[in-house]
């Protein structure tokens, strides 16, 4: 009888402690392989996901918000943690070219699987990877009945830095990313482009950026609050013309949001966190990928001694290009880039980019003959493709143009988008622009 009573009491205690155990699982930590960086992730009492980062006993990022807002609902609160999953990887991979041949990819991973407690009970996973010299995280929208096609209207991602460190940044401009770099405290910044290079203290340098941007809007950040002397940066994405930020369909993954962490500024140059967060190269045979220096016909246009458009000062002529090819061959340059060779420059090309033709050369420019001449000298032309921002016109000619260049033995193309907008309405760094750049890469 007494044994039965104790058994019942034990069961009651177990059930009483079960909610506490479940609450304890609403937060977890993951450390880098050496243990020097530790990331904590979880959800608060309102079900809002967050993360923080420490280096040893030093706080780098205070609890910072995570999540998304959609056109038909919110994915930034009312969550519970379904489970935490862990993984680790330690591998070496080889670059076709770069500062070093072999790169070590060593990290510990924590996946926080979330489900909303009410309403549609949508699911969202957040994957964290912690390296010895930085960390990254991304959002994963799993396949689910309650989420098919969706539109992101705001990304709630924040980086809440300890203190108000100084940073080198480029100001955000919807048309061009060509401002001047400035150094100032984060609290004094407006909306800025990434990367954001941060000097927190003499032995703490960081770089905030993104990785694996394939079908998403480009990341910018801006300070949204300074509380207790700590600055909070929030993600600001480049929109479509109608205000949408990202158009997607589950299953779907976001780019990585990343922070490299170094003791010295120079360490940011050799930091490989961003490279390691990108997908492995999809090109199986990379033996043909080589580096090379080039010269070209373009600076004389800016000096106003020659012109892009045909006329008495036309720079892209057969005779002039041969001079550059001879110079390149004599001085060890592998390529010659020629601007103004193709039809379209005779128009107001900043407004009429849709009139560019990427296979038809001006009469005074022997395109195929010049490439044969260059090859005989151990040099090659680089095809210059200025679009004037007319992305659709370029996409419609990609197959024909690239087939011609390949047939001629041209191995490199330099594209251009000199315009505030793409196709007269979309920002170059929006999802629209990112999708276009991917089409060009894949066609090449």
Where are these regions (language model features)?
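Bacterial Sec-dependent N-terminal signal peptides
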Residues: 1-27
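N-terminal accessory beta-strand-rich subdomains and adjacent acidic, glycine-rich linkers
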Residues: 27-284
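Short, flexible loop/turn elements at secondary-structure junctions
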Residues: 116, 130-132, 163, 262, ...
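Generic recognition of flexible, low-complexity loop/linker segments
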Residues: 125-126, 244-247, 323-325, 401, ...
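Conserved, mostly hydrophobic/aromatic
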Residues: 139, 328, 416
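Intrinsically disordered, low-complexity acidic regions
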Residues: 240-242, 283, 322, 334-344, ...
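An acidic-aromatic substrate-binding cleft motif
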Residues: 249-327, 331, 335
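Aromatic- and carboxylate-enriched substrate-binding clefts and catalytic-loop regions
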Residues: 339-444
């Amino acid at each position: 009888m007494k044994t039965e009573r104790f058994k019942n009491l034990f069961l009651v205690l177990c059930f009483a402690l079960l909610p506490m155990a479940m609450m304890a699982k609403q937060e977890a930590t993951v450390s880098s392989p050496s243990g020097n960086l530790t990331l904590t992730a979880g959800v608060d009492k309102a079900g809002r996901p967050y993360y923080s980062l420490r280096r040893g006993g030093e706080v780098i990022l205070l609890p910072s918000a995570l999540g998304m807002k959609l056109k038909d609902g919110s994915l930034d609160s009312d969550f519970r943690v379904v489970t935490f999953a862990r993984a680790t990887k330690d591998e070496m991979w080889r670059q076709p070219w770069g500062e070093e041949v072999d790169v070590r990819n060593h990290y510990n991973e924590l996946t926080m699987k979330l489900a909303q407690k009410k309403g549609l009970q949508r699911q969202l996973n957040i994957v964290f990877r912690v390296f010895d010299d930085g960390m990254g995280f991304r959002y994963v929208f799993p396949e689910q009945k309650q989420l098919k096609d969706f539109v992101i209207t705001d990304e709630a991602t924040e980086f809440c830095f300890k203190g108000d460190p100084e940073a080198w940044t480029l100001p955000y401009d919807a048309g061009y990313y060509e401002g001047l770099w400035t150094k100032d405290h984060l609290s004094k910044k407006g909306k800025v482009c990434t990367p954001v290079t941060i000097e927190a203290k003499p032995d703490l340098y960081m770089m905030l950026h993104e990785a694996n941007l394939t079908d998403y809007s480009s990341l910018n950040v801006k300070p949204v609050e300074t509380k207790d002397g700590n600055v909070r940066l929030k993600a600001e994405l480049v929109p479509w013309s109608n205000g949408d930020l990202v158009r997607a369909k589950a299953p779907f993954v976001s780019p990585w949001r990343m922070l490299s962490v170094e003791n010295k500024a120079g360490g940011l140059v050799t930091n490989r966190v961003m490279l390691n967060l990108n997908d492995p190269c999809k090109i199986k045979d990379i033996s043909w990928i080589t580096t090379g220096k080039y010269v070209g016909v373009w600076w004389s246009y800016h000096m106003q001694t020659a012109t892009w458009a045909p006329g008495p000062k036309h720079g892209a002529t057969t005779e002039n290009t041969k001079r550059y090819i001879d110079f390149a061959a004599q001085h060890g340059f592998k390529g010659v880039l020629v601007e103004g060779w193709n039809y379209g420059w005779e128009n107001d090309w900043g407004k009429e980019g849709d009139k560019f033709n990427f296979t038809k050369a001006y009469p005074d420019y022997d395109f195929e003959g010049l490439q044969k001449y260059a090859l005989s000298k151990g040099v090659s032309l680089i095809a210059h493709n200025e679009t004037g921002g007319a992305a659709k016109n370029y996409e419609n000619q990609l197959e024909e143009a690239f087939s011609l260049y390949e047939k001629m033995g041209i191995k490199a193309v330099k594209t251009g988008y000199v315009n505030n907008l793409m196709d007269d309405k979309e920002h170059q760094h929006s999802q629209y622009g990112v999708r276009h750049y991917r089409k060009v890469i894949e066609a090449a």
